Amino acid sequence: RIGGTIDRMDSKEGTLRIVDYKTGGSPKVPANIEQLFTPAEGRPNYIFQTFLYAAIMARQQALKVAPSLLYIHRAASESYSPVIEIGEARKPKLPVDDFSVYEDEFRERLLKLLEEIYDDKEEFTQTEDTKKCEYCDFKAMCKR
C-alpha cells in the first residue's frame, strides 16, 4: 500500500495547484524526470512525492495540475517562488506549471520502478547508509 497526504490544493484560473509544505531543506532542481528515480545522495525526493500527488490528481479532475513545494523558512523572501523547476545545470530552467508536459514520462518511469519493486526475481539489497533506516517503516523486516 502506498499512501500520503497532500498538504494543500487550491484552484485558480483553470489550474489546480498541489502544494507540499517543507519546513527544512532547500529547493532542488532535477535535470530531468529520470533523476527523480535515480538512487543518489541529494536526490530530489520532495519533487518525486509532489509529482506522485500530481499524477494522481491529474486523473481525477480536468484542471491543469501544477505541483509546487513551499519551503516555509524561505517563503518570506520576495524572490522566492514555490514553483518546481526542471533543467540541466547552467542552462535555463523550465517551470513545472503544467504537469501534463511531464506526466507520461513520469508515469512510464513510475510503472517501471513498481515492476522492479514487485519483481520476485529481483533481490532485495539493504542500503549501506543506516541513517536512512531510522525512520523506515520496513526496518524490522530487514532486521535493522
Spans of model-derived segments:
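RecB-family 4Fe-4S metal-dependent nuclease core
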Residues: 1-144
